From Swiss-Prot:
This is Ribosome biogenesis protein YTM1. It is found in: Nucleus, Nucleolus; Nucleus, Nucleoplasm. Component of the NOP7 complex, composed of ERB1, NOP7 and YTM1. The complex is held together by ERB1, which interacts with NOP7 via its N-terminal domain and with YTM1 via a high-affinity interaction between the seven-bladed beta-propeller domains of the 2 proteins. The NOP7 complex associates with the 66S pre-ribosome. Interacts (via UBL domain) with MDN1 (via VWFA/MIDAS domain). One of its GO terms (molecular function) is ribonucleoprotein complex binding. InterPro entries: G-protein_beta_WD-40_rep (IPR020472), NLE (IPR012972), WD40/YVTN_repeat-like_dom_sf (IPR015943), WD40_repeat_CS (IPR019775), WD40_repeat_dom_sf (IPR036322), WD40_rpt (IPR001680), WDR12/Ytm1 (IPR028599). GO terms for cellular component: nucleoplasm; PeBoW complex; preribosome, large subunit precursor. Component of the NOP7 complex, which is required for maturation of the 25S and 5.8S ribosomal RNAs and formation of the 60S ribosome. Keywords: Nucleus, Repeat, Ribosome biogenesis, rRNA processing, WD repeat. Residues 99-444 are annotated as: Sufficient for interaction with ERB1 and association with 66S pre-ribosomes. Belongs to the WD repeat WDR12/YTM1 family. GO terms for biological process: maturation of 5.8S rRNA from tricistronic rRNA transcript (SSU-rRNA, 5.8S rRNA, LSU-rRNA); maturation of LSU-rRNA from tricistronic rRNA transcript (SSU-rRNA, 5.8S rRNA, LSU-rRNA). WD repeats lie at residues 99-138, 140-178, 194-231, 269-309, 311-350, 357-397, 408-444.
Length: 444
């Protein structure tokens, strides 16, 4: 295989839903010297599109980043090999858009109602408008915040190292039927207590909240405090204490006047800290958690039972669901992302695929709102990577834009969110909320 005249037999196919992008699947011969651009020209010719469209190509699930000849050599294949070549619309690089300042490390991010919500190590939740202005701050946690999640235009939930979750009131609209009394905007509706160690992850589905903690447990809560059991902060004093002593205790107790609530259910099965938890996107009676005990657990949230455990070889630190593909993506302490089929009756093959490229812990994941095959990941190596899960290597790597970032000193990324209408939002040790392009990602 030496000359440019050498050809290889191949068949093009696509999984694009748009049928105008489907070619006839008859085999053709193409020069082995072709790279992505040349293959794109062939597909455009076959499609007879009015306007040329760039494509990416995958062979056996691997994105083609070289010539066909280099691919064949790398795989030890001859030019006699028949190649099935998948093509997809090319994805644009996630170009840098802007950065917002935060007062401390950014541990968590969410988006809702055209606002960005950040949880910070200074214990404050902040609401940013899309221009980067801080519109509101929520203070109450007594330690670093580890997770924040938008619930609705009137509700927000956060969790942190102080072992609690807090339900926040963001504004007064339509709340009179829910709340017993008017509470000022930006104030705590309820403190949710029950965990015995830092609460590091939360997810929300409709009126339910899941939390994961370093106490090895997962808890289920309601977004409406009336549904949860009241906790009396005086209860642990016992019945033989004078009224005066109780009054003194209440005065010294931080936030003593704020209502406190217990979880609807507590899930115990993990044997090490639980690092992340999510609801199933198509069935909110099912939850998934990942832990430093190397396992992925599936929970029946109705019966509070663990219905499936999948054991991997590494501590798991983050999780995201790709529902159309029946896959969970899990970030690990071993620097890679593993893909798993969470279904109880799925194949005995625990790990379906590994995505390799990060150089440190993979601590946050999110899915692309435009494409069921794409995810982004945040790592302590200082990068966010964009992946097509049909390939085991990253499509793009996003680095920190702040010039004050020193590699290995203050470049860890702790949080990433891929939000339609906003982009790929990330934050970490550099105290910046960085936004990269994440909308209209396909070339036209």
């Amino acid at each position: 295989m030496s000359t440019d005249k050498t050809q290889v037999k191949l068949r093009f196919f696509t999984r694009e839903e748009d049928e105008t992008l489907h070619v006839n699947d008859a085999p053709i011969y193409a020069p082995v010297s072709l790279k992505r651009y040349g293959l794109s020209e062939i597909v455009n010719h076959l499609l007879e599109l009015p306007k040329s469209m760039p494509f990416d190509f995958l062979i056996d699930g691997e994105l083609l980043r070289t010539s066909l000849q280099d691919y064949l050599i790398k795989k030890g294949l001859s030019s006699e090999t028949f190649l099935n070549v998948e093509y997809t619309r090319a994805v644009l690089p996630p170009s840098y858009l802007s950065s917002f300042d935060n007062e401390d490390w950014v541990s968590s991010l969410d988006v809702g109602s055209n606002y960005i919500y950040s949880g910070s190590y200074d214990g404050i939740v902040r609401t940013y408008n899309l221009s980067g202005k801080v519109e509101k701050q929520y203070s109450g946690h007594s330690g670093p915040i580890r997770a924040v999640h938008y619930i609705s235009s009137t509700r927000l939930v956060s969790a942190g190292n102080d072992r609690t979750l807090r339900l926040w009131k963001t504004k007064n609209d339509d709340l009179k039927s829910i709340d017993e009394e008017e509470i000022e905007d930006g104030k705590t509706l309820a403190i949710l207590e029950g965990h015995k160690a830092p609460v590091v992850s939360i997810d929300v589905s409709k009126d339910r909240i899941l939390s994961a903690s370093c106490d090895n447990t997962v808890s289920l809560w309601s977004t409406n405090y009336k549904e949860m059991t009241v906790i009396d902060p005086m209860e642990d004093l016992g019945g033989n204490v004078s009224t005066a002593a109780k009054k003194r205790r209440k005065l010294t107790l931080k936030d003593g006047s704020i209502r406190r609530r217990a979880p609807l259910a507590l899930f115990e099965s993990h044997s090490a800290p639980v690092e992340a938890v999510i609801f199933d996107k198509s069935d909110d009676t099912v939850g998934y958690s990942v832990s430093q005990d190397h396992t992925i657990k599936t929970w029946d949230l109705i019966t509070a039972k663990c219905v499936d455990t999948k054991t991997t070889s590494y501590s798991l630190l983050s999780v995201a669901q790709l529902p159309k593909l029946n896959l969970l993506a899990c970030g690990s302490s071993a620097r890679h992302i593993t893909l798993h089929d969470p279904r109880v009756n799925s194949s005995s093959k625990i790990t379906q695929q590994q995505l390799v490229g990060h150089k440190n812990f993979v601590v946050a994941l999110d899915t692309c709102p435009e494409n069921e095959y794409m995810i982004c990941s945040a790592s302590h190596d200082g990068t966010v990577k964009v992946w097509d899960v049909r390939s085991n290597t990253a499509m793009y790597t996003i680095t920190r834009e702040d010039k004050n970032v020193v590699k290995g000193v203050n470049d860890k990324v702790f949080a990433v969110k891929w939000a339609k209408g906003v982009g790929i939002i990330s934050g970490g040790q550099d105290k910046k909320i960085q936004i990269n392009k994440g909308d209209n990602i396909f070339s036209n």
